């Protein structure tokens, strides 16, 4: 599920696998249901920084130190006033996930309401600059006529239990909810319930009464949440006709340690080695403490890693290696079989790779306030209680991986599978690119639209960019010292036993090797195919910035920043892409995400990399004249004046 999306599956189309994917029957795709036909519509608008109307001087200036006290005249008030001015007739609520990022930009998010009920797929995000003025903003608010009748007066909607049953029956979910056994228990919020007495789901299903913006109007719906493992769904069931589903969002989008070290993508690139105290000393804690105690196993503040051979929802009591001396060194070779014989090494590798990535992202700005994955946020903002649950050798499938991203405060869940396209089969935990790809789904879902909103990559092109970001970060991290812009990279080559990887083309700056252009997205319905186009553009961006700023010492794990700006082109590209995610609107398209990256550079470097960024996108058809249309995109190789 992508961000409440089940993001992932290295997300492979089945036709690229040497063997068909196998799994237990809980997955929607395995129950003959195509949830992609229920995607949310892509309706967001993004007003980039140089298109924002001129503003009068504001009294509040955001602090570059990250001081985000909410008081009269602060950045939240500025954002609220801007919304009132822009859409004076709109009713809305402030989403409680605003924060000031490490670049000094304040991010504030609003949800539209009607009769006190959320219009669930309407969002207004305002980005406040260091000068206290509106820097940019995104908008998907409904501008049509609001229904005159208040449904709360006549209670003109179905019982939530009926909606749950409608979702189960329509989507053929492996959940049992007999009317005589199920009780809808009210929880905090208007018409908000948790269901007790069901079976088959990983946690108690939930339902909330909302409006949904669809086909130019509003439909009253029950938003039914069901976590069934391979999918974690928000199903929008018509509040009067419970056999009608309007839309579906899937949150699941794919000490001393002896491991393949950071930068070694898989066993073909290097050897395992013993690494002592790998965490960054200046971050909050080491990897085995969460403020409540020390864990002499693969558990800590950022992640909890274990085997999960049954593929079930339990993880707390699952097997994980233990070492009172915190020495996690276990045997592994590619010749070992079955995978259970090296489970300790697999779990340790997964725990190591994920924690290093957490720390790298933290330095680049994905921290507590931005919605990262930590049990204890150490009073630094955001919502805690949400480490990443990491399942090694998960028994729910093969030849894939996925990551479920609920909103901030709920743990993310990564499922890593074994791959049977080789003999002996291979464990995806030993291919860092797969782990990084999956974890990045959690990052992009938390940053886009704010940490409290995990459905902002649920549209087709948005979801495609989610896959592209995941491929981009996995590729950027594996660069070697001798690489140049002539170096090409694959995805999933080792695990899948496919020399050309699992994407249509290698990532390359050579248009013969990888000819992808923006307009290639026309007619595509696979998020992975669309994602390859987006990642191809970002690979161009990566090398343009490396050619200008160098790639730095790729053997060093920790990014080097000066005045908040990475000193090398590789980490600068990663930083700009991350900052762009936080600026862009909910459900963005390629054009809006490009503009957000340009705006991120304007904030971070005063736009000193403007031309490098434009040249990267224009090379592949996303230049100045590019226009988004879901069925007929307009490509452009045009550069702005001065480039």
From Swiss-Prot:
Family: Belongs to the peptidase M36 family.
PANTHER family: EXTRACELLULAR METALLOPROTEINASE MEP
A molecular-function term among this protein's GO annotations: zinc ion binding
Region (Disordered): 47-71
Protein role: Secreted metalloproteinase probably acting as a virulence factor.
Organism: Arthroderma benhamiae
Gene name of the record: MEP4
Location of the protein in the cell: Secreted
Names of the cofactor(s): Zn(2+)
Main location: secreted
Biased composition range(s): Polar residues: 60-71
Co-factor remark: Binds 1 zinc ion per subunit.
Positions that bind Zn(2+): 437, 441
Biased composition (Basic and acidic residues): 47-57
Glycosylation sites: 271, 420, 510, 553
BP GO terms, sorted: proteolysis
Propeptide: 19-254
Protein origin, superkingdom: Eukaryota
Keyword Protease: yes
Protein name per its UniProtKB record: Extracellular metalloproteinase 4
